[in-house]
Regions:
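N-terminal Rossmann NAD(P)H-binding glycine-rich loop of SDR-like oxidoreductase domains
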Residues: 1-26
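Rossmann-fold cofactor-recognition segment
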Residues: 48-61
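NAD(P)H-binding glycine-rich loop region in Rossmannoid oxidoreductase-like domains
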Residues: 59-97
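Conserved Rossmann-fold NAD(P)-dependent oxidoreductase catalytic core, especially the SDR/UDP-sugar
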Residues: 103-147
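Active-site Tyr-X1-5-Lys
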Residues: 131, 146-172
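NAD(P)-dependent short-chain dehydrogenase/reductase
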Residues: 161-217, 222-226
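Mid/C-terminal beta-alpha module of Rossmann-like enzyme folds, strongest
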Residues: 201, 228-286, 326-327
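Amphipathic terminal alpha-helices
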Residues: 276-278, 290-300, 307-330
Length: 330
């Protein structure tokens, strides 16, 4: 089984690579080769029985996608994207990377020929939905995004559905919850503060909160996100029928509830490292995001996530902090 990971240098790409190398198989088949691709250098890969190669390049550049699929990988994880805040700030870059790059990949797959139809797992987003919202958004709710990022993801969902319908590939679009708590340095995603206000205080640093504590959002841990990707790849798009986009399980909670969970686990002094500093641009973007979902379709297929935000924090402590946190005197 040959695997291609596009966007392999990102947080999910790294964790997915680690998971695949550690397990050595997917869908009951041994993994013989993993090709990692990104516009930046990927970190050194973990030890693996599979042959691991790494390439740098831009999927939106002519010929790059054709080069990647020439080896006919069996499963393709397409994780690469310009994130929400950056896609809103740089209109041309967002469409070039998020839409043109994806279209290039789909066309490259289509032109391989010889009955080649790989399984494609695409990371979409709950940003494909726009207000006004019902109390809980199901998969049947209209995709009407209110940001450039959400629009780009929604267009790609339609393309993947059509290319799957035509038999060029076996694709599925995963409407991922906001992944929290993201390790490492903050990125340019407008949603980054959801992770920052947990990760930084746990590491002994102050964090900025740019929105009100009443803001509600939909979360899942990086561990759950990797499990979503692997389960989708093993399941295949046929399980989704004609509707190839699916909203994945998560946890709906307010920023205030996040901070209550942080204090319960790490103490009041750690909670007090979060400082309110309103940012009108971020507040405007977040105000158009959905808050709660009915993921019963995904759950019926076996997808699972955390049951509480305390669980999400504990996953971060276990996976990123060696099971312990830095505290200060109360």
């Amino acid at each position: 089984m040959q695997i291609l990971i596009i966007g392999a240098a990102g947080m999910l790409g790294r964790k997915l690579t680690d998971h695949l190398c550690r397990n050595g198989q997917i869908a009951g088949q041994p993994i013989t080769k993993i090709l990692r691709h990104d516009v930046v250098l990927c970190p050194p890969p973990p030890a693996s029985a599979a042959a691991i190669s790494t390439e740098m390049g831009d999927l939106s550049v002519a010929g790059e996608a054709e080069r990647l699929v020439a080896a006919r990988p069996d499963i393709i994880f397409h994780l690469a994207a310009v994130v929400s805040g950056e896609a809103e700030a740089d209109f041309e870059k967002g469409y070039r990377i998020n839409l043109d790059g994806t279209r290039n990949l789909l066309e490259a797959i289509r032109h391989v020929g010889g009955n080649y139809a790989p399984r494609l797992v695409f990371t979409s987003s709950i940003a494909v939905f726009g207000s006004p919202f019902p109390d809980a958004i199901g998969d049947e709710f209209l995709a009407s995004p209110l940001t450039s990022y959400g629009t780009q993801k929604a267009i790609c969902e339609l393309l993947i559905s059509d290319y799957s319908r035509r038999g060029f590939l076996d694709g599925m679009s995963l409407r991922m919850p906001t992944v929290c708590v993201r390790p490492g340095l903050p990125n340019k995603a407008a949603s980054g503060f959801f992770s920052n206000i947990i990760r930084e205080p746990l590491a002994g640093n102050d964090a900025v909160l740019p929105v009100d504590e009443t803001v509600r959002h939909w979360h899942a841990s990086p561990r759950s996100a990797v499990n979503f990707l692997v389960q989708a790849a093993e399941m295949g798009g046929a399980a989704l029928g004609a509707r190839r986009a699916i909203t994945l399980p998560g946890l709906s909670c307010t920023v205030g509830e996040q901070l209550v969970a942080l204090e319960k686990i790490a103490g009041k002094a750690v909670r007090q490292r979060v400082k309110s500093q309103p940012d009108e641009n971020i507040r405007r973007i977040v105000a158009g995001w959905p808050q709660n979902f009915d993921a019963s379709r995904a759950k019926s297929l076996g997808f699972r996530s955390e049951n509480s935000f305390e669980d999400i924090i504990r996953v971060h402590i276990e996976d990123e902090l060696g099971g312990s946190i830095k505290t200060v005197q109360q």
